[in-house]
């Protein structure tokens, strides 16, 4: 119920933001166009956000014949978690990570990268997937996917605003200088807004998924070992430009933050500190 409320707030916020932008740069006509665009975006975010995220990473669905061990793990964990088995996807990327998506447990998917499959042991992968199925069970996946779509739209608007500022705007308000200033302000603030949206998806849900995942697998130590390896692996991974652009809007979805953090990144951290997560997991007994 809480996640559905947050999703509704996000969708309403997206509508309000787009309408305000449309009104500022295009007056009444711009506001109407922005509202219609927002309605389409809201519909798409709810029904297709999971597909958008999977397509963003070029994830491919794998069959039991292609990945028997992966399906064996998901089969067992879904049974223990008492949820329908999600679809299983693999992302061809050296970045060691995993995420879950879907609007509800009946329409869910889990995705792992080839990097994580090459890095972790069978039991560690089991620990990671138990964490992801915990997100499915806790219904975190819809709001995460919607937030990723929302952040993507805002990032797109920021890019558009930068080009508009460079070329003098697109003929909105009568005050040309004011319009250009508006574009510049939007270009600067939009990426920050996208990050704040991801922060709104509470870090506490990662602790909750760690605990629930440990209960499902009965192997908290396996997830703890996996998190340590993933933290190290992601910090040494050199992503492509496309990877970076995708991760900026969906970093909150992954089991560990795929973005390399500086001081500012640490201030706007989308995940709890990995050391704290590991400490809590190692203290668990089932």
Swiss-Prot record:
Disulfide bonds: none annotated. Its EC number is 3.4.24.-. Zn(2+) binds at residues 131, 135, 206. InterPro entries: HtpX_protease (IPR050083), Pept_M48_protease_HtpX (IPR022919), Peptidase_M48 (IPR001915). The active site is at residue 132. GO terms for molecular function: metalloendopeptidase activity; zinc ion binding. It is a multi-pass membrane protein. It holds the Pfam family Peptidase_M48. Gene3D superfamilies: Metalloproteases ('zincins'), catalytic domain (3.30.2010.10). Its cofactor is Zn(2+). Binds 1 zinc ion per subunit. Keywords: Cell membrane, Hydrolase, Membrane, Metal-binding, Metalloprotease, Protease, Transmembrane, Transmembrane helix, Zinc. GO terms for cellular component: plasma membrane. The chain crosses the membrane at residues 7-26, 30-49, 141-161, 180-200. One of its GO terms (biological process) is proteolysis. It is found in: Cell membrane. Its main location: membrane. It is an enzyme of class 3 (hydrolase). Belongs to the peptidase M48B family. This is Protease HtpX homolog 1.
């Amino acid at each position: 119920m809480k996640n559905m409320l947050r999703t509704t707030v996000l969708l309403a916020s997206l509508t309000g933001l787009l309408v305000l932008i449309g009104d500022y740069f295009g007056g009444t006509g711009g506001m109407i166009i922005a509202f219609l665009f927002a309605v389409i975006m809201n519909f798409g975010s709810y029904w297709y956000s999971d597909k958008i995220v999977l397509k963003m990473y070029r994830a491919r669905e794998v069959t039991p014949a292609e990945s028997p061990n992966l399906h064996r793990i998901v089969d067992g964990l879904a049974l223990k978690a008492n949820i329908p088995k999600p679809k299983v996807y693999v992302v061809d990327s050296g970045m060691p990570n995993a995420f879950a998506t879907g609007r509800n447990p009946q329409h869910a998917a889990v995705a792992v990268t080839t990097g994580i499959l090459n890095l972790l042991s069978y039991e560690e992968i089991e620990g990671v997937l138990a964490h992801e199925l915990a997100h499915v069970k806790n219904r975190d996946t819809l709001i995460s996917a919607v937030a990723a779509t929302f952040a993507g739209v805002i990032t797109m608007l920021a890019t558009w605003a930068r080009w508009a500022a460079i070329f003098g705007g697109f003929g909105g308000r009568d005050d040309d200088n004011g319009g250009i200033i508006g574009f510049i302000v939007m270009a600067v603030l939009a990426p920050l807004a996208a990050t704040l949206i991801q922060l709104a998806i509470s870090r506490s849900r990662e602790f909750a998924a760690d605990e629930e995942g440990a209960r499902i697998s009965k192997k908290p130590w396996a997830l703890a070992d996996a998190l340590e390896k993933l933290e190290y692996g992601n910090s040494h991974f050199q992503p492509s430009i496309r990877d970076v652009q995708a991760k900026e809007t969906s970093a909150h979805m992954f089991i560990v933050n795929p973005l390399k953090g500086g001081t500012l990144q640490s201030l706007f951290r989308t995940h709890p500190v990995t050391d704290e997560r590991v400490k809590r997991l190692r203290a668990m007994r089932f």
